[in-house]
């Protein structure tokens, strides 16, 4: 039934189960709406889900929050219970309980005003593989609830929360060897009556408030009060983790024996790290969101002093209409210190056959999971080994889609993928048995999923990775690595520690006001220094000027030829000869250099500027056999001198030249400070005069690594410029 507009502006529609839903919308502050919800979750049940990571065709930015939901559905094993937290929840519980009476495959237990207990019956027949997702499980109840509230009129109303790892064993059972704690919950899903939605593209936020009614039952006018349960910290200090150093590497060796026998192709065991929570969960959530943006950021208060704080990079299952999507992640490398180092790491990752094999196996298993529930021929890889970059890691990701068959729904798709091979392994069932036999503790929420099941039939869930579980004041961080036959045990152990590091940093630094690593500050060595930059019709001269200005120097750029009155007016402390096309003779560089030397001015040459200085002092120039235009080179620093002081023995630089100074005929007063691998001069300094030059471009993107180019410019301004030398004296 289509929604109708009521006199007070509210909207009303009737669900498939005959429930009349009334929705009232009010505007909220876009700038700070989500912050208030995050703070409230320290002492109130609910969830905040955010995407603060964008990827075209895959992820956009959004926020959704629910606090003080009136009802929750929880389970452990085949036991399930539905709890009402206030009078409004009592109405919802009564509506659901009445509907569940007609659901086969469940046994209803005790029913009170605020709690319904029930049991999922064991299957009474053999289910084929094609219909395995229809077996009696806790999802039987979830299907009934979503069917009761089903409507196409609202895309936000649904169930919000977390799905635990052990739910997979209702779909495909294995022998459990690890003991589960008595208070473990495999699922906690909230049914909200108020939802905050933040639309970042429209820069708007609003709150939808819902009332529910059927026959003589209605939430209208019922009390919504729920008592808070403040977070409680503890004084006890937990152990470092559930593995001693080197023990995970030993597990890798055991896994390789399984690979050798053919029992497994890959497996993803994890280890757990502990930290005491000295900050509130909300502070940890804010910190993690700031330092580790992700498409599935979440903060959930599950009640009973249990919280989940996470920044998952991986979609689990997303269903929109009949379309089902997943984005398996496998292949990981550490971020570089800057964009140039990142690019080198990306090349290394893409060239890694091991990482390619990891992702290939993950995606082949994922395609198999979809083939169980999708229309034949509809399962397609729409993105292959695409790069996604996060705060500390770079991943390779595939994007796979399919179309659900008409007899399948989002829950079928969800169950068929439980759990992703990226957190289990392949073959999946054997990998899960290996994990159960070799991990030190039950996974609880790790490796499961978080997110939302819409009453319109859609679903949006992320894998529970990069997650902090806080239980009774102690934080747990679990991280795993994808193991293959050619895995290096020590490297895999280090990868688990690296993956956990961002979570641990968020716990330890939650009270820090700084949300991100600050860039290196440029030294203000140029204050009071005047620089004359001679432009040889170059296309990079303004970037070069920008670098010098960052030191605090005053820069005047003048195209050659430079008149005497320019020198008199600018009164430079340093003359910089820019790069340019052609040869130094095309710009009569000797004349410029002669004027500068007559005034005893320091000179720094870049590219063409080096060639000009070498030629002006009596040297010869030659032409490269192969031009170096826009090409990076690894150069050797022979003498640090002025320019390369504080840099390493090797530096990657950007080159744009066909001409070079002949080293066999370089005037003896010049010292070669750097050269390329083939012996081409890359840097010179005069032994007696304040003159230095480089053949490459310090301002190029290719010289950004380690901020090398900027550091060279700082050195030139600090130690070559005339006024700088005077100050130093």
Swiss-Prot record:
Residue intervals of the Glutamine amidotransferase type-1 domain: 530-726
Pathway given in the UniProt record: Amino-acid biosynthesis; L-tryptophan biosynthesis; L-tryptophan from chorismate: step 1/5
Protein keywords: Amino-acid biosynthesis, Aromatic amino acid biosynthesis, Glutamine amidotransferase, Lyase, Tryptophan biosynthesis
Pfam families with a match to the protein in the record: Anth_synt_I_N, Chorismate_bind, GATase
EC assignment: 4.1.3.27
Gene3D superfamilies hit by this protein: 3.40.50.880, Anthranilate synthase
Biological processes per GO annotation: L-tryptophan biosynthetic process
Reactions accelerated catalytically: chorismate + L-glutamine = anthranilate + pyruvate + L-glutamate + H(+)
Top EC category: lyase
Lyase as UniProt keyword: yes
SUPFAM superfamilies the record matches: ADC synthase, Class I glutamine amidotransferase-like
Residues binding L-glutamine: 580-582, 611, 658-659
Active-site residues per Swiss-Prot or TrEMBL entry: 607 (nucleophile), 697 (for gatase activity), 699 (for gatase activity)
A molecular function (GO) term: anthranilate synthase activity
UniProt keyword Lyase, yes or no: yes
PANTHER family: AMINOBENZOATE/ANTHRANILATE SYNTHASE (PTHR11236), ANTHRANILATE SYNTHASE COMPONENT 1 (PTHR11236:SF9)
Entry protein name: Anthranilate synthase
Source organism (scientific name): Rhizobium meliloti (strain 1021)
């Amino acid at each position: 039934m289509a929604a109708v507009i009521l006199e007070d502006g509210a909207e009303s529609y009737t669900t498939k189960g005959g429930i009349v839903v009334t929705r009232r919308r009010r505007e909220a502050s876009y700038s700070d709406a989500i912050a208030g919800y995050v703070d409230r979750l320290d002492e109130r049940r609910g969830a905040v889900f955010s995407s603060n990571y964008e990827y075209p065709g895959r992820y956009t930015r959004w926020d959704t929050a629910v606090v003080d939901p009136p009802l929750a559905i929880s389970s452990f094993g085949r036991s399930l219970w539905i709890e009402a937290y206030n009078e409004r929840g009592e109405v919802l519980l009564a509506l659901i309980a009445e509907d569940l009476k007609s659901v086969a495959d469940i046994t209803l237990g005790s029913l009170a005003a605020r709690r319904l207990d029930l049991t999922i019956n064991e299957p009474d027949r053999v289910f084929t593989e094609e219909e395995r997702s229809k077996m009696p499980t806790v999802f039987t109840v979830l299907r009934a609830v979503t069917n009761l509230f089903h409507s196409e009129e609202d895309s936000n109303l649904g169930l919000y929360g977390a799905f635990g790892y052990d739910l997979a064993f209702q779909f495909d059972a294995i022998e459990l060897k690890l003991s589960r704690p008595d208070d473990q919950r495999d699922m906690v899903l909230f049914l909200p009556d108020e939802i905050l939605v933040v639309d970042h593209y429209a820069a708007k936020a609003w709150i939808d408030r819902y009332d529910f009614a059927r026959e003589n039952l209605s939430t209208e006018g019922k009390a919504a009060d729920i008592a808070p349960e403040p977070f409680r910290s503890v004084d006890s200090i937990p152990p470092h983790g559930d593995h001693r150093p080197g023990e995970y590497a030993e597990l890798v060796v055991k896994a390789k024996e399984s690979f050798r026998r053919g029992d497994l192709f890959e497996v993803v065991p994890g280890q757990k790290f502990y930290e005491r929570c000295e900050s509130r969960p909300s502070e940890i959530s804010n910190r993690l969101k700031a330092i580790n943006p992700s498409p599935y950021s979440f903060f959930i208060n599950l009640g009973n002093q249990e919280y989940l704080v996470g920044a998952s990079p991986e979609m689990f299952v997303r269903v929109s209409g009949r379309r089902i999507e997943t984005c398996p992640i496998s292949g990981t490398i550490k971020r570089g210190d800057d964009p140039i180092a990142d690019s080198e790491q990306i090349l290394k990752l893409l060239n890694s056959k091991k990482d390619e094999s990891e992702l290939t196996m993950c995606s082949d298993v994922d395609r198999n999971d979809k083939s169980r529930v999708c229309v034949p021929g509809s399962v397609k890889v729409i993105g292959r080994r695409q790069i996604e970059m996060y705060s500390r890691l770079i991943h390779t990701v595939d994007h796979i889609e399919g179309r659900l068959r008409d007899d399948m729904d989002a829950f079928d798709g969800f169950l068929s993928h439980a759990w992703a091979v990226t957190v289990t392994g392949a073959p999946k069932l054997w990998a899960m048995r290996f994990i159960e036999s070799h991990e030190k503790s039950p996974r609880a929420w790790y490796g499961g999923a978080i997110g939302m099941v819409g009453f319109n039939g859609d679903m949006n869930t992320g894998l529970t990775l990069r997650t902090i579980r806080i239980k009774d004041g102690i934080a747990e961080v679990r991280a795993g690595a994808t193991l293959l036959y050619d895995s290096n045990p020590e490297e895999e152990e280090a990868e688990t520690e690296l993956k956990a590091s961002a979570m641990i940093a968020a716990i330890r630094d939650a009270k820090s006001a700084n949300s991100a690593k600050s860039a290196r500050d440029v030294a203000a060595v140029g204050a009071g220094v005047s620089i004359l930059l001679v432009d040889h019709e170059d296309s990079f001269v303004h970037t070069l000027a920008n670098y010098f200005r960052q030191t605090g120097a005053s820069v005047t750029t003048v195209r050659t030829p430079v008149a005497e009155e320019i020198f008199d007016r600018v009164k430079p402390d340093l003359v910089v000869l820019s790069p340019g096309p052609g040869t130094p003779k095309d710009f009569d560089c000797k004349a410029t250099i002669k004027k500068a030397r007559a005034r005893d001015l320091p000179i720094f040459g870049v590219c063409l500027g080096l060639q000009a200085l070498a030629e002006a002092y009596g040297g010869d120039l030659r032409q490269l056999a192969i031009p170096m235009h826009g090409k990076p080179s690894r150069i050797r620093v022979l003498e640090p001198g002025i320019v390369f002081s504080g840099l390493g023995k090797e530096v990657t630089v950007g080159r744009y030249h066909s001409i070079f100074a002949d080293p066999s005929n370089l005037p003896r007063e010049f010292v070669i400070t750097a050269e390329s691998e083939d012996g081409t001069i890359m840097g010179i300094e005069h032994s007696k005069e304040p003159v230095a030059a480089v053949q490459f471009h310090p301002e190029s993107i290719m010289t950004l690594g380690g901020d090398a180019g900027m550091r060279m410019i700082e050195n030139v301004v600090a130690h070559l410029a005339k006024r700088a030398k005077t100050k130093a004296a």
